[in-house]
Amino acid sequence: MEVTLLFAAILSAFMIVLAVRVLDLRGSPVTKSFHRPGRVIDPLELERAIRGHGNLIEYAPLFLILMLLLELTGASETFLYICCTVFTAGRFMHGIAFSFMKKNGLLRIGGMTLTFLGLIGLIISALLKILS
């Protein structure tokens, strides 16, 4: 369970970073001290930050549930670390591309590719475990 716990903590911490970015762009009193006087927020920038945050929330829970189930059924710890590292790198790339950059093509595509590779690795492992 330690592999899942570690990556759940890392992904949760990154989720908070992305959430604070959204709060900042919305002009929340929580992040008011970060605002520059006369700062104008681009609505597209806010929308992208919201999607960067939302996208992590859409993928991470399913990944972590599948990860925990595999870990509890005795999957290789090395394999789980590899899948989690790939998935987490993808989520970081995608989240940064969406939430902090205006032009993000390569980072965004690379992020989704790594996200899918990590998730597909777990899916295949789960199916093989069921079939064996």
Show the residue positions of the predicted features:
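Alpha-helical transmembrane segments of multi-pass membrane proteins
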Residues: 14-17, 86-91
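Short alpha-helical packing/oligomerization segments
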Residues: 66-89
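Cytosolic, membrane-interface loops and tails of multi-pass inner-membrane proteins
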Residues: 20-51
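Alpha-helical transmembrane segments
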Residues: 3-18
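Core segments of transmembrane alpha-helices
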Residues: 54-67, 119-120
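Interfacial loop-to-transmembrane junctions
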Residues: 93-118
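Juxtamembrane boundary at the C-terminal end of a transmembrane helix
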Residues: 123-132
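Physicochemical signature of membrane-embedded alpha-helices that form the seven-helix bundle of GPCRs
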Residues: 7-10, 50-53, 83-86, 111-114
